[in-house]
């Protein structure tokens, strides 16, 4: 899936999201802008919009969504008023079918709506504050399944109605017939879909193949991210590069190779678990266990997101060095290489001196 997304910078800093018409990046996620500068939208505003489905084509995309689909959803939103601020652009509806509440993403937060986000399962749902209690039981069921089987391919049993993103009805009160027609069209599209595939990391809702515990995609990305290694005993899977650059994984020596991509399986599982709390600097999704090598830097990435964000990867197999420097610190790698070279020479000299001293002691005895 090609990506034409670029970070907002320079003259584009004043651009506003086509949905919420704001610059609330802290609440709504990164503001993504198309290459032609004509479309801008917050990542969260797109992820939770009712009629947006992830794009799997090679055409231009915005945060994993088709530019054309984003434009259609923005246009649909011009006729949908927010239940909290009463402004247009409210394409995020309560997931209870009979509820007519619709929001902007930040308005849903301010109105204390319940946000359900499970990227590895492609689930992005909102329940208004009135229906929080209704959603509680299904949330508990989902959480249990997510904790136990996050890395396990979805089975037909797991695709119960309560775990799907359901189509939302919008508030048609006071809208023209044309508006009702447009809004209903968006709802009809959702009803024809068996699953709301919102995650740009997912390939297909019917795809039951193993997915990487870090980047949440499967073997289709092997060429760019390395072989997908599968550990059936723990229902775990991970791409080689995702493990190689992950901060906490331990690569085994040549004399003790494991069957899980030459990595200590325990450290891989620990990293996957840690990754659930680590959101990517670029895409805001969990699983970002690759951190910038500069200690003071807080940027973390998925392997492919680091590449996309022009971070610099240092890979020296002979010396076992695998590092990432974000684009702001990419100039520091040369200095680190020099320091490591000096340290390596110093260690080598100490070892030689120790060997000579030991030999002299043996000869003296």
Swiss-Prot record:
Residues 14-132 are annotated as: Extended PHD1 domain (ePHD1). Its main location: nucleus. It comes from the Eukaryota. A zinc finger (C2HC pre-PHD-type) spans 14-52, 209-249. Residues 209-330 are annotated as: Extended PHD2 domain (ePHD2). The modification Phosphoserine is found at residues 138, 145, 155, 183, 199. Residues 157-171 have a biased composition (Basic residues). The modification Phosphothreonine is found at residue 358. GO terms for cellular component: kinetochore; nucleolus; nucleoplasm; nucleus. It is found in: Nucleus; Nucleus, Nucleolus; Chromosome, Centromere, Kinetochore. Residues 342-352 have a biased composition (Basic and acidic residues). GO terms for biological process: blastocyst hatching; negative regulation of transcription by RNA polymerase II. InterPro entries: EPHD, PHD-type_Zinc_Finger, Znf_PHD, Znf_RING/FYVE/PHD. It holds the Pfam family zf-HC5HC2H. Residues 139-211, 330-365 are annotated as: Disordered. The PHD-type zinc finger 1 mediates both nucleolar localization and interaction with UBTF. Interacts with UBTF. Interacts with the NuRD complex component RBBP4 (via the nucleolar localization motif), the interaction mediates transcriptional repression activity. Transcriptional regulator that associates with ribosomal RNA promoters and suppresses ribosomal RNA (rRNA) transcription. It is linked to Boerjeson-Forssman-Lehmann syndrome: An X-linked recessive disorder characterized by moderate to severe intellectual disability, epilepsy, hypogonadism, hypometabolism, obesity with marked gynecomastia, swelling of subcutaneous tissue of the face, narrow palpebral fissure and large but not deformed ears. This is PHD finger protein 6. The lineage of its organism: Eukaryota, Metazoa, Chordata, Craniata, Vertebrata.
